[in-house]
Amino acid sequence: MGQTKSKIKSKYASYLSFIKILLKRGGVKVSTKNLIKLFQIIEQFCPWFPEQGTLDLKDWKRIGKELKQAGRKGNIIPLTVWNDWAIIKAALEPFQTEEDSVSVSDAPGSCIIDCNENTRKKSQKETEGLHCEYVAEPVMAQSTQNVDYNQLQEVIYPETLKLEGKGPELVGPSESKPRGTSPLPAGQVPVTLQPQKQVKENKTQPPVAYQYWPPAELQYRPPPESQYGYPGMPPAPQGRAPYPQPPTRRLNPTAPPSRQGSKLHEIIDKSRKEGDTEAWQFPVTLEPMPPGEGAQEGEPPTVEARYKSFSIKKLKDMKEGVKQYGPNSPYMRTLLDSIAHGHRLIPYDWEILAKSSLSPSQFLQFKTWWIDGVQEQVRRNRAANPPVNIDADQLLGIGQNWSTISQQALMQNEAIEQVRAICLRAWEKIQDPGSTCPSFNTVRQGSKEPYPDFVARLQDVAQKSIADEKARKVIVELMAYENANPECQSAIKPLKGKVPAGSDVISEYVKACDGIGGAMHKAMLMAQAITGVVLGGQVRTFGRKCYNCGQIGHLKKNCPVLNKQNITIQATTTGREPPDLCPRCKKGKHWASQCRSKFDKNGQPLSGNEQRGQPQAPQQTGAFPIQPFVPQGFQGQQPPLSQVFQGISQLPQYNNCPPPQAAVQQ
């Protein structure tokens, strides 16, 4: 909290001192603590309030309205804030050039009730010197015809006389009077605190116009008059904003304002109230110098480069954008492009933007790619015909000739454009911590992913991995078809290689894939499945088709066209007429080789292609082979048949198994 108070005190130091002097001279004492609290609330809910302060009563009325809105939303606004706000608003009323009045109704009703109760409790004597704790009446609401304006100005604006370096005799036409510590006479006191009825009576009194000269911190500083066509305006010192020096004459706020640059003033005032006091300035501005002696007509004017640093608001926006969205998010790219192309950025500006917005690791990446891009650009400059005289020191802002801001401000437009292109390219290559850049081959469209999202991912990866613009374009167009899902490929296939010259291929692909995945596309797929309608340049059929006629519903062996042609084809190939009756089945006019009947005309089953013989009897086999019995004396000779049968009858008769005794012997 202490740091916030010290920050507010240092930020509005000049304006706080002016307000305290103004209120003290009016007879109202406000502590510095309460003023700091007031400006804390103003900075919280009114970010457009300028640091140098304002003397415009409309601004303070706007502050009151916004504080009321904040109170309605549940924010707590202390009563001391309303008290100080009403006092300052009332004190600034006499300094307005229009008939503006301050109403006590702007303050909360509770403040007025408390003020009236305290007033009734005090005696009349005490009330004359009492300062209300809640609401102050309009400052200088009474008649101030007899007020010594010179003395009032000398007390309120002592710093102005010191800045001018002249005596108070230049303040007004009357003679100067020595300053005293005693207050003004009772009839000349410009501030009175009276009941609420007196406020309404004093509303009808016209405000008094003063001839004043506020301190230098509160002066309205317009752009240089050389922008309005006034020749001979001396240039501002190097390193400072292009503001003219404060005039030494007195200003009369009642005089009609000049119309020179009034539109520009309105734009600047609007930006100032919105909180961007540097909206109309650039880091480096080029202003035409007045023509010198001996200058010829048609000769290009000489320009002077002046540098202006970035505003804190702009750097803060960059830092918050990088932290919240990432350095290469669409928001940050758009913001960076607007800053880069809307300003004349020198290498020092790019380094300030990167250091204030990026983390140390990200800044190291940016610096590395910056140096790499500079080396590549220098090689191109040397290879150009004729060679471009821009070296690496100039593009990096280093070396003896380009290390200072004043030297970089004199860079040529071609060098500024090269620095811009190199730094934007280096910024695009920055990777978030913990993330890696995938290959463009691995970027594929999901089954339910919209085609524009897939193309955006593909372009982002290709932009980070492919440096050559032409090669990047060709690869993106190829991968936009190859890595798309089957549905998008079917829609893109008729357009592949047929996009007219001058048209963007990716845009045509996106148009062709518009609506895929929606209800209409699903209905078309269903109709396609039923009827086989052509969709996306392909005929999609479901089911089996005939390889002879190409129709769906039957196979080639059942094709009616083929069956009708078989007889004619065979007749022409064999050179003979078909028979009258099949010799095999006796019931059809076809050849016997083509007969497929299983029964003849009498119903008898037909064999295959030829007649079969009688079936053979099955052979019986035993466990042991039977050897024929041959009697002795007939080895090598054929024994008589009677003896063979006699030997067979003498063999033991047993079945497939040997007798038990033989099994035991074995």
Curated annotation (Swiss-Prot):
Polar residues compositional bias, start-end: 604-622
Principal location: membrane
Protein name, per record: Endogenous retrovirus group K member 6 Gag polyprotein
Superkingdom field: Eukaryota
Region ranges (Disordered): 165-264, 598-642
Membrane topology label: Lipid-anchor
MF GO annotations: nucleic acid binding; structural molecule activity; zinc ion binding
Keyword line: Cell membrane, ERV, Lipoprotein, Membrane, Metal-binding, Myristate, Repeat, Transposable element, Zinc, Zinc-finger
Any GO CC annotation of this UniProt entry: plasma membrane
SMART domains with a match to the protein in the record: ZnF_C2HC (SM00343)
Segments forming a coiled coil: none
Repeat found in the keyword field: yes
Chain's gene name: ERVK-6
Lineage: Eukaryota, Metazoa, Chordata, Craniata, Vertebrata
Pfam families according to UniProt: Gag_p10, Gag_p24, Gag_p24_C, zf-CCHC, zf-CCHC_5
Pro residues: bias regions: 232-247
Record's comment describing the protein's domains: HERV-K Gag polyprotein contains regions homologous to the matrix (MA), capsid (CA) and nucleocapsid (NC) proteins from infectious retroviruses. Evidence suggests that HERV-K(HML-2) Gag polyprotein can be cleaved into mature MA, CA and NC under certain circumstances. However, the exact boundaries as well as the size of processed Gag proteins have not been precisely determined yet.
Compartment(s) of residence: Cell membrane
PANTHER family: ENDOGENOUS RETROVIRUS GROUP K MEMBER 24 GAG POLYPROTEIN-RELATED
Recorded family membership: Belongs to the beta type-B retroviral Gag protein family. HERV class-II K(HML-2) gag subfamily.
Protein species of origin: Homo sapiens (Human)
Listed Low complexity bias regions: 624-640
Post-translational modification: Myristoylation is essential for retroviral assembly. Alteration of the glycine residue leads to a block in the budding of particles and an accumulation of Gag inside the cell.
Keyword presence, NAD: no
Zinc finger (CCHC-type): 544-561, 580-597
GO biological-process terms attached to the record: viral translational frameshifting
Function as written in the Swiss-Prot or TrEMBL entry: The products of the Gag polyproteins of infectious retroviruses perform highly complex orchestrated tasks during the assembly, budding, maturation, and infection stages of the viral replication cycle. During viral assembly, the proteins form membrane associations and self-associations that ultimately result in budding of an immature virion from the infected cell. Gag precursors also function during viral assembly to selectively bind and package two plus strands of genomic RNA. Endogenous Gag proteins may have kept, lost or modified their original function during evolution.
Lipidated residues (N-myristoyl glycine): G2
